[in-house]
Every structure is written in structure tokens, then in C-alpha cells.
Amino acid sequence: MAHTTPRSHPPPHSLLQNLTTQSLLLSHLFTLIASPPNPNTSTQTQLNQVYSALQLSTLDLSGLVKEVGHHQEAYRRLVEKKNEVAGLEMRVRGLVKRLEEGRKELEGMIDQGERSLEDIQKSEREPVPAKTLMAHAQSLSKHSSAPVSSLLAPVDKAQYAPWPTEMSMRMGLLFQLEGSMSGMGERGVVGEEQKAPQKVEERREHVEHEESGRRYDPNAVFQLDLNSDESDED
């Protein structure tokens, strides 16, 4: 009844097979012990066989345990190597990505250099006259030159009036009123009740007639002689 576990199976299968064999041997051993002695069969011989099979199975189990330990250690090292390889792969991917970016940048620099070289060669083949360049620069200077500072330019006193203009007074008032041309405005406390403005009734002016026979002309213009003294002298 001796049983040898084949080493070709994986460790979990070998362990399960060994434990099953030991369970069967122990059940057979308990059956022999519990059964009454039979004179026709030798009980002692059967007990010795079961005991020997249990010893062999136990030795096989100890070997399997050692083998599983070595297997687990090898698997742990394999996992470490796998993680290390994954990290190296990420680094390699990053390096490849940066190399690709550098390659594109280098190609752009080469293209720009080739275009610059073509422009230089074209300018050498077709030089622009100095007069044309000066005329172009003078036409651009009207729009690109910086304005002359008022501190350096001569001051024309004839263009300034001895009194402030209306615009300067308005600008001064605008600065004082912080941007409002309509005055400071109404102020009040938040939540304060404001009285409604009273309506002012428009009253028509009463026309007084000096004489009942004369007609009142509102559009009449009266010219008064203010130089009465001069008229008297004349």
C-alpha cells in the first residue's frame, strides 16, 4: 500500500493527493483497530502495513512542504523581478517619448535653418538697393517712431489761453466728482424711508393789461435806449 507521489504534478495537486492518501490510511487504521480480531486474518500484519504506508506518506508530505516553500520563494522573487521590469518599462517608455519630442524639435530646427539659409542665399543673389531700404524705413518711421516728449519739445505759449477752457474746467470737476458729470447725487442710509417728491403745480402767468383797448403781444420786442444821457446832450 506504499504510495509514491509523482513530482510531475504541481504542488497544490500533490499536497491534496497526499492528504487524501493519509486520510484513507487513517480511516483504514481506525477500522482495523475497532473491528474484533479475526482468527482467519492476521490483524497485526495489516496494522504494520498501514503504519508503514503512513510513514511513507508523512515523509512524502514533508518533502512536498519543502518543495512548496522553495516554490513560494521562487515565486516571490519572480514577482519582484516582474515589478522591477514594469518600472524599467515605464522608464523606457518615458525615454522613448522624450526622444520622440526631441526628434520633432530637431526636425523643426532643421527646417527653420533650411528656410533661413534659403532666405540668406536669396538676399545674396538679389540684394536690395540702399535707397529702397532708406525709403521703406522712412515710410515706417512715421508710424513706428516714438512721439517726442512734451518736456523736450518747445512750448508754444500762444496756443494756451490765460484762462482755463471749458473742457479743462469740466475735466477738473469730473476728477473732483470721481467720474460723475451730474454732481455728487443723493445720499442716504440703507433702509431709510425717502419722502416722495411733492408735485409742483404749474401756474400760468397772469397777463396784466394796461389798457383794455390794446392787444397783448407776447412776442413783441422792446428796444430800450440805454444811452439816454447821450441823447439828451444831442
UniProtKB/Swiss-Prot annotation:
Q: What is the lineage of its organism?
A: Eukaryota, Fungi, Dikarya, Basidiomycota, Agaricomycotina
Q: Which UniProt keywords apply?
A: Activator, Coiled coil, Nucleus, Transcription, Transcription regulation
The protein's organism comes out as Cryptococcus neoformans var. neoformans serotype D (strain B-3501A) (Filobasidiella neoformans)
Record's InterPro entries? Mediator_Med4 (IPR019258)
Q: Which gene encodes it?
A: MED4
Q: Where is the composition biased (Basic and acidic residues)?
A: 189-217
The GO terms describing molecular function are: transcription coregulator activity
Task: Look up the record and report any one GO term of the cellular component aspect.
Answer: mediator complex
What name goes with this protein? Mediator of RNA polymerase II transcription subunit 4
Recorded coiled-coil stretches: 71-124
What are its GO biological-process terms? regulation of transcription by RNA polymerase II
